Amino acid sequence: MKAQSLPNKYLIVVVGPTAVGKTDLCIYIAQYFKTEIISADSRQYYQCMRIGTAQPTIAQRQEVRHHFIDCFPINTFYSAGKFGKESLDLINDLFNKHQYLLLTGGSGLYIQAVCEGLDEMPEISLEIRGYFNNKYKKEGLSALVKELSIQDPDYYKIVDLNNPQRVIRALEVCMATGKPYSQFRLQKKEEHVRPFKMIKIGLNLDRNLLYQRIDQRVDQMMEQGLLEEVRALYPYRDCNALQTVGYQELFGYLDKRYTLEEAISLIKRNTRRYAKRQLTWFTRQTDIKWFSPNELEAIIGYIHAFTGDIGIS
């Protein structure tokens, strides 16, 4: 059954790599259109990860209402599919009082879950699931990443290679079907058509400038108390939510595998690599209009041109 059509309702989707400036831009747009922001960041959902995931500050969340921020306990499993369903329910509800809504994040799969939907994946047997979980425990993530590069090189180029859940999921599908996981992801179905219109905006910067901003953000996070945040989460270090850049490296420091200087350097390097994979994901999409984050007037003008609106006084 198709969803009821929502004419003249627009979901403004703002994507881009980490540290590019999505939060500040979305707050500006949300204030301009007097609307709300839905986060599609797969780590900002979790409580107790405020610094390491660069959650919007309390002051920013008081300026503009944000959804799916700081709302789940650290040990909660929250998938892209579940997010897609729950966020669509929220979007349909919020469109009762807003003409425009914002969806933003750097997690491509979560953005896709809302904008396009995710195709049903094959059932995975307990034997296959157990095989890869045991391999992960015995050989570590690097062995799984190497296998993924062979089994599905296309997905290898865009997935967060520091996230064992996503790497294992892809390998499970490869083994269960004999086909690359990316082949299932790229399928499109008619029932995924959304009843509202989408305006997709991408943010990017010169690569060197982006990397400088990443390094500066990491330094700022350390000054804000990232190490103390990670130390408090150490008992939960095996939770999926914490298998991510910034936390894994500092867990390594706490385990005395790295010096603090080495851990910080690794966070910067791995964040730059993650940003590159984010850009690879998003630049493959032809319906995204790209801007620099400081092109505020041009972005607002593009939204008005898309909707045929002459502007808001």
Curated annotation (Swiss-Prot):
Pfam families: IPPT. It catalyses: adenosine(37) in tRNA + dimethylallyl diphosphate = N(6)-dimethylallyladenosine(37) in tRNA + diphosphate. Substrate binds at residues 18-23. The record marks 107, 129 as: Interaction with substrate tRNA. One of its GO terms (molecular function) is ATP binding. Belongs to the IPP transferase family. Monomer. Catalyzes the transfer of a dimethylallyl group onto the adenine at position 37 in tRNAs that read codons beginning with uridine, leading to the formation of N6-(dimethylallyl)adenosine (i(6)A). It is an enzyme of class 2 (transferase). ATP binds at residues 16-23. This is tRNA dimethylallyltransferase. Residues 41-44, 165-169 are annotated as: Interaction with substrate tRNA. The keyword Transferase applies. Its cofactor is Mg(2+). PANTHER family: TRNA DIMETHYLALLYLTRANSFERASE. It comes from the Bacteria. Coiled coil: none annotated. One of its GO terms (biological process) is tRNA modification. The gene is miaA. Keywords: ATP-binding, Magnesium, Nucleotide-binding, Transferase, tRNA processing. Its EC number is 2.5.1.75. The keyword Membrane does not apply. InterPro entries: Dimethylallyltransferase, IPT, P-loop_NTPase.
